[in-house]
Amino acid sequence: MEQQSLNPEPQQGDLNWRLSAHPITLLCFLGFRTSALLMYLFGVLFIKNFILVFIITLLLLAADFYYLKNIAGRRLVGLRWWNEVNVASGDSHWVFESSDPTTRRIAATDKRFFWLSLYVTPALWVGLAILAIIRLSSVIWLSLVAIALILTITNTLAFSRCDRFSQASTFANRALTGGIVNNIAGGLLGRLFK
């Protein structure tokens, strides 16, 4: 009789950073996400200077925004976004870019970590904003939470739109490619049997 182990082997898609295709990118991504929250929550306990805690938290939020937008999104899920401004008209529009699904395989673990963290972090900041309002704490703390909300929600909305755009363009490409192949094949077969 075989003895079954109590610890099953980790499967791709489990929340285990060792299964990541890009473990360093994933750990840096999660590190920036959690360090800003931890500095906001516990910074005053370790650093007595409020201004220093505010500045460090703000720098961690900016680093998280930059790293997620320019590095983690591209490496972990193959998505990237940016905002372009037309100099002549002053209009701005968002540009979304995704890797080709036929040439790049996204690891299920990376995808789960990315999307879970992307949606959980703004929810945590919303909870902290509600607590700051209820406690009637300093306006400066509330302003820091507002900045955190703006940065995290911007990335969340942009990557959600980018993912939707990516799925739609993949569907359109498959339909277009399939339609072209069917038209060519139908045309050739039609000519052969005329």
Swiss-Prot record:
InterPro entries referenced in this protein's UniProt entry, alphabetically: TVP23-like
Gene Ontology biological-process annotations: protein secretion; vesicle-mediated transport
Keywords, alphabetical: Golgi apparatus, Membrane, Transmembrane, Transmembrane helix
Membrane topology label: Multi-pass membrane protein
Subcellular location: Golgi apparatus membrane
Transmembrane segments: 19-39, 41-61, 114-134, 139-159
Coiled coil regions in record: none
Pfam family, one: DUF846
Primary location recorded for the protein, binned into one broad class: Golgi
Gene Ontology cellular-component terms listed: Golgi membrane
Family that this chain belongs to: Belongs to the TVP23 family.
Physiological role: Golgi membrane protein involved in vesicular trafficking.
Protein name: Golgi apparatus membrane protein tvp23
Organism expressing this protein natively: Aspergillus oryzae (strain ATCC 42149 / RIB 40) (Yellow koji mold)
Gene this chain is encoded by: tvp23
